């Protein structure tokens, strides 16, 4: 039985993440002073999309050791401190903790219990307080290895039974696939178990997890998505996009990890094409602006990420946020904003496997109407 299966059996949705906080002796904070200018960019006062990174932004270069990685959002002392306006150059591990390397490796045999989705961080953002927002502009995500892996774990997937979704019939066997990365062609290749069939996928790296400490001092496992971010498995958390996360605790305690090289909508088998990433992100702080659920932006699109169960509640969370955003930007009535979003938004199912499901609602910003005389 895999660690993911054990986790799903261990607690109902409402109780997931209510684990004891790690002590300071377990996760000692690192000094972590960014290189470069002592005075970083001042906190921003409005949540406008980040279009470029200042050339003189201070840089924190940090390669975490394996023992530096964390497996919860909240409950871990910060490993680094940064000022707003800092560029972070670092690395992060895959969801299997780097332990699964070949098709013969089974996660249940190779992974220590509780070591799903290791995170790089937490980063303490100086000046961040509850009610603020951290803006994480993803500058660069690149495969850090020449291979990636995917796996099916019994009891973990959209089309098998578990303690929350009962089904008759036997489960599928635990199975691993290894993907070879062709960096020159930007593809990943795999073969069927009997070797008779081969396929390849375009590589489009993204973070499976990115988040801050949850509200109320809660500690959440890195399996779970929520309003704090977490294990959203959203392909839009990629280079060129900016992720906005509401601050719930002093310093925000930003973490990211669970590198993905590719993934289909729904992540229906329970894992993407998983691999370690070389990372460059730029972190800003927006004071006195709350962000109730994760928002993603680029030059052309606005996106909201909703998580919950049942699936329709995840969609409702994201649609509600989108309607409120359109109303604020356009100054249309609530009903007109509702109608506009109803006819224009796209809503792909992001994942159907975690304790909370995730739906992305996205909209072309250029379609939002402006008032006429």
PLM features: residue spans?
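N-terminal, Lys/Arg-enriched amphipathic/low-complexity engagement segments
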Residues: 57-111
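N-terminal secretory signal peptides and thylakoid transit peptides that target proteins
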Residues: 1-14
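Conserved mixed alpha/beta catalytic, RNA-binding, or beta-rich assembly cores of soluble enzyme
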Residues: 207, 214-231, 235, 241-311
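Short, Lys/Arg- and Gly-enriched loop/turn segments at beta-strand edges
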Residues: 95-106, 141-151, 251-261, 350-352
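Short, structured beta-strand/loop micro-motifs enriched in basic residues and often containing a Trp
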Residues: 63-73, 113-119, 220-228
